[in-house]
């Protein structure tokens, strides 16, 4: 309700130290009112800088860039121009602008970057999985509990790849 993604994290952090402009009051279920300041944007920053919580992982912008760069050079332009955010973690206000800024900084300067954040993206992962599961070709990849118990994880490779 109060969290957002900062377009410029360092600048937002500096501003929060010298001003209370980002502070918002929030009423807890028990009626207690708390003031939330820099936490509003610091929590979402972990998506871009996992090192803030001690994780050695690339941020979502770097992961997106690396994924595009592993694809055939002929389709990269289309991929850069069609980055679609999906899932509940993309519901933070400001995430599309920040992704666009970060991908633009990583991508070749000639690339046109377009990041789309559809309003229904919170459920798009579920919708996609549901469509996939309903395809007749997908049913041959289903794994019964007994099959998994007999073969272990290797059954996934045999049936799905």
Curated annotation (Swiss-Prot):
**InterPro entries per the record?**
Actin (IPR004000), Actin_CS (IPR004001), ATPase_NBD (IPR043129)
| Protein's cellular compartments | Cytoplasm, Cytoskeleton
Q: Which EC class is the enzyme in?
A: hydrolase
At the top level, the lineage of the source is: Eukaryota
Keyword Cytoplasm attached: yes
Q: Which UniProt keywords apply?
A: ATP-binding, Cytoplasm, Cytoskeleton, Hydrolase, Nucleotide-binding
Q: What is its EC number?
A: 3.6.4.-
UniProt keyword annotation of Cytoplasm present: yes
Catalytic activities: ATP + H2O = ADP + phosphate + H(+)
A single GO cellular-component term from the record reads: cytoplasm
Question: GO molecular function: any one?
Answer: hydrolase activity
State the similarity comment. Belongs to the actin family.
Entry function: Actins are highly conserved proteins that are involved in various types of cell motility and are ubiquitously expressed in all eukaryotic cells.
Entry protein name = Actin
Could you tell me which species this protein originates from?
Pinus contorta (Shore pine)
- Identify the taxonomic lineage of the organism of origin: Eukaryota, Viridiplantae, Streptophyta, Embryophyta, Tracheophyta
